[in-house]
Amino acid sequence: MVSYKAFLITLAAVTRVLTYPANSSFELVDRSGTPSSTGTSGGYYYSFWTDGGADVTYTNGAGGEYKLQWSGNGNLVGGKGWNPGSAKAVTYSGTYSPNGNSYLSLYGWTTSPLIEYYVVENFGTYDPSTGATLKGTVVSDGATYKIYQTQRVNQPSIIGTATFYQYWSVRQTKRTGGTVTTGNHFNAWKALGMNMGTFDYMIVATEGYFSSGSSDITVGSSTGGGDSGSPTSAPTTSPTTSPGGTCGALYSQCGGTGFTGSQCCASGTCKYANSYYSQCL
């Protein structure tokens, strides 16, 4: 005869079996989508990172193209470029459609010192300069960029959790496509005491934070996708006396095809950027 206690144990076991369906695959869905990864694709270095909180799909296309689509909670950043980075004229084109907090930027890292840097070309509803320290401005590639510095304490980095500075150049007229002359920003940062170290990777990146959106970006450069040379400084032009006898202030234009203003610098030296533009840095 089965005891009452044994009957209750058997009934409880049957109840547990009936409570959970045999097919419970819905519990195993990976909401993060594409996992974090780095590597090469189409002759370019790529980096994609996510904290796993968002629904995100990152896809490498041919050559310098990549596509990114995301939504939901979480942080993610991905794109194509070079490893190591360097001072070069980076070209990019495509589409960028953010909804919320997101950046489209030339993005990278250096070590010794550990620096995370952004040249922000476009952004969503949140201005990345919020709460940052304004250091100055630089004129490059047809626009003014405001320069900021922030510090990150015990945050994720390319060497693990660390404390480091972030350098920002934020374009004041948003765009999606054009040329980013990285050396102009590196030189301007240096002139402001914002020193960089040894270059790690450098990409044209899309970043999203608790937001949604999509991007389809193609990256290139004047030196080709495979270039990974050492950082170089722009040539220096010798100062000359201006027609009016007054030299330009720091960050002002001091040369270029068709330029008729002052060709000397009261502060800094006249640095050549391209045939159309030189600047006091």
Swiss-Prot record:
The active site is at E116, E207. Belongs to the glycosyl hydrolase 11 (cellulase G) family. It comes from Botryotinia fuckeliana (strain B05.10) (Noble rot fungus). GO terms for molecular function: cellulose binding; endo-1,4-beta-xylanase activity. PANTHER family: ENDO-1,4-BETA-XYLANASE A-RELATED. Pfam families: CBM_1, Glyco_hydro_11. Endo-1,4-beta-xylanase involved in the hydrolysis of xylan, a major structural heterogeneous polysaccharide found in plant biomass representing the second most abundant polysaccharide in the biosphere, after cellulose. May act as an elicitor of plant defense responses in certain plants but does not exhibit any cell death when transiently expressed in N.benthamiana. It catalyses: Endohydrolysis of (1->4)-beta-D-xylosidic linkages in xylans. One of its GO terms (cellular component) is extracellular region. Residues 246-281 form the CBM1 domain. Residues 32-220 form the GH11 domain. Keywords: Carbohydrate metabolism, Glycoprotein, Glycosidase, Hydrolase, Polysaccharide degradation, Signal, Xylan degradation. It comes from the Eukaryota. This is Ethylene-inducing xylanase 1. Glycans are attached at N23. Pathway: Glycan degradation; xylan degradation. Its EC number is 3.2.1.8. The keyword Chloroplast does not apply. Residues 1-19 form the signal peptide. It is an enzyme of class 3 (hydrolase).
